[in-house]
Amino acid sequence: LDRSSAASDVYKRQQVLNSIDSESTNPIPVIYQSGYLTIKGYDEEFGMYRLGFPNREVEEGFVRFLLPYYANVNKVESPFEIQKFVREVRSGDYSSFFRRLQSFFADTTYEVIRDQELHYENVLFIVFKLVGFYAKVEYHTSEGRIDLVLQTDKFIYIMEFKLNGTAEEALQQINDKHYALPFEMDERKLFKIGVNFSAETRNIEKWIVEEK
């Protein structure tokens, strides 16, 4: 999954948009010709088309379509699972949220996961991208770690995910780097959550929470 193609507009030349063959590894022409992407602009100087999702409904539908291919959830259950995620973060039930997230990684065979770290990041990206249609989400990745800020009307979640480390280290980083400082005067309840991913079990192993 190229997360940039699911996160923002992309630029492609016309010959790329019209070229689909069995040897091509570029998903953009297929996505474009399937109707998920539309032309939003054209750069005459470089002959590049700017592509993007025509509206929120189409973008959400596309990301929902991806979910069963990356997580342990079937196509029928997928929309309902995301609804449960959203309800849990809106109600402050982070334990149920993470148990549900664990189930998304369960029973995924080692053969399916060619790049374990990339697979983990892709699943998290898709889940939080979908949750982001209903709550404010800021998501960043960098060298084996993911930091996330998720906001609802009543709650703020600051999460640090360690792909090679401990939940304690993840929570310590939130505190050491003062990730919660911008929300110091916010009246909403704040959760600082450190999470680690186990290479042995290929799943979320532990999460630690500090509440404000």
Model-found features: residue ranges?
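Acidic-basic catalytic patches of nuclease active cores, encompassing PD-(D/E)XK
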Residues: S103-K136
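A short, conserved structural fragment
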Residues: S34-Y42
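Active-site metal-binding core of divalent-cation-utilizing nuclease and nuclease-like domains
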Residues: V127-D153
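Conserved catalytic cores of phosphodiester-cleaving nucleases, focusing on short active-site segments
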Residues: L124, L148-L163, K177
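Single conserved hydrophobic/aromatic residue that forms the stacking wall/gate
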Residues: L1-A7, Y11
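Short, amphipathic alpha-helical interaction segments positioned at domain boundaries
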Residues: G52-Q83
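Domain-level recognition of nuclease-like catalytic cores that cleave nucleotide substrates
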Residues: P182, D186-K212
